């Protein structure tokens, strides 16, 4: 029996001279990221410490900045900032005013070493303590954008599947969970017993998740409206109905269908209004389709040449036709475009290394770079602004974890870990925007 739990979810100008100053120095092959220190000029209670702690964590979870926190003491005026001892390139100075019970005004100022003026300042008014993490992520987005010129992703969400009792014959519990990007504020939005939930994927407007599941002994593709919890079955073909993903405009989905009980699956595009299908592939086992950011092509996995690899097909071709992405790749699965369409991130099984890692394929020069070094890394999903990749890592004991890595492979951190083999974490999908 399915139980639905409804989920309700609750500045872009550039400063050219600031960005010109923000250049990472390269010393002996190591990129030195600009250091940001977060301090407060008045520690009124624990609330400032909690907010600043989250800001520091956010500014360490990216490829362009690093941060630390010196809230153990107060800075009364910007002239008193001990730049020499801080060794910081920038300071984020926060001031908290307790307006009333559990309600604050927060002022944020960005300061630069050897500069006596504020670079940027913003004020957030009437913030309730219950919004502590949301406020911190919002401040982090503001700081990140002002210091890098790129949009922050700290108010984005992750959807993923948690399976309890995965090896039991009966009583397996599948939960579709939505959390903040860093794993906090988890909400179960769909719960099913003995009917798997697989490969969730967001619509571009963030309103729907499409996924595959079983019901009544047959496989189908479903949409979940996040705000209401409404589930709609949209396919009912015999055999395999799997790996759905939305087109950028939300009018179509790409999916894998066997159209019967054959040993082959093919990629189709379904018009969500008419339910009309367009076939994209014609032979082999084809699965895990993803649209390009412009919606003009689909990247997917196929074994048509004897082993799984990545192929690309045009959505506008009159007849099914596709080509292998690169002969440099030995075996590959689960491809995803980066938001700018310049790279493809995938699960890589190289002939030179054991196990599977997450890798990045550069479409311009054809280079392949592993960005993780685990033995069983899978299911990559790219952040909406392209800086980070979330994925599943499984250790030698079979315990799974939801982890994150920067696209350059430099910054790794854990989001959630299954602390025993009786729980599996699967199929992460990154939301397309901040909420």
Curated annotation (Swiss-Prot):
Record family assignment: Belongs to the TolB family.
Subunit structure: The Tol-Pal system is composed of five core proteins: the inner membrane proteins TolA, TolQ and TolR, the periplasmic protein TolB and the outer membrane protein Pal. They form a network linking the inner and outer membranes and the peptidoglycan layer.
SUPFAM superfamilies reported for this sequence: TolB, N-terminal domain (SSF52964), Tricorn protease N-terminal domain (SSF69304)
Protein's name in the database: Tol-Pal system protein TolB
Species annotation: Francisella tularensis subsp. mediasiatica (strain FSC147)
Pfam families, per database record: PD40 (PF07676)
GO annotation, cellular component aspect: periplasmic space
Signal peptide: 1-20
Record-level GO BP terms: cell division; protein import
Subcellular location(s) of the protein: Periplasm
The protein's role, per its UniProt record: Part of the Tol-Pal system, which plays a role in outer membrane invagination during cell division and is important for maintaining outer membrane integrity.
Alphabetic keyword roster: Cell cycle, Cell division, Periplasm, Signal
Source domain of life: Bacteria
Major place of residence: periplasm
